[in-house]
């Protein structure tokens, strides 16, 4: 079991997530890696491991998020896309929890 599968195994009973591969998502990935895909109220996320990026903790995780946020001066919510690199399995799980529960600072 790889790290992405391990993370999925720890959260699959809490949330409606998909464990698949990046090419199957047809989201513009140019390489094929295992990925956890999830949708939350304001958007969606992809969590995958980039094995080509050096990391002192092992594999480098990439948490990519697309979300909408309402601002006081716009009638329609604005779409944002960002990503970061959780350093551990536990950090990746915490990020999933925060988004799925609507508690991440990006979407508050």
Regions found by a protein language model. Name each.
Residues 10-14, 31, 44-46, 63-67, ...:
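Polar/charged side chains located within well-ordered beta-strands of beta-rich proteins
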Residues 1-41:
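Negatively charged, low-complexity tracts enriched in Asp/Glu with abundant Ser/Thr
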Residues 1-2, 101-108:
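Short intrinsically disordered terminal tails
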Residues 88-100:
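A short, charged, amphipathic alpha-helix used as a generic interaction element across diverse proteins
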Residues 41-91:
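Intrinsically disordered, low-complexity regulatory segments enriched in Ser/Thr/Pro
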Residues 7, 18-20, 24-26, 48, ...:
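Compositionally biased amphipathic helical and low-complexity segments enriched in hydrophobic
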């Amino acid at each position: 079991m790889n790290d992405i599968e391990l993370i999925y195994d720890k959260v699959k009973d809490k949330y409606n997530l998909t464990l698949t591969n990046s090419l199957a998502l047809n989201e513009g990935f140019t390489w094929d890696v295992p990925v956890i895909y999830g949708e939350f109220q304001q958007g969606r996320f992809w969590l995958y491991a980039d094995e080509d990026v050096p990391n002192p903790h092992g594999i480098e995780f990439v948490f990519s998020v697309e979300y909408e946020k309402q601002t006081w001066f716009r009638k329609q919510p604005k779409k944002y896309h960002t990503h970061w690199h959780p350093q551990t399995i536990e950090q990746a799980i915490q990020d999933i929890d925060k988004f799925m529960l609507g508690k991440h600072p990006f979407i508050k």
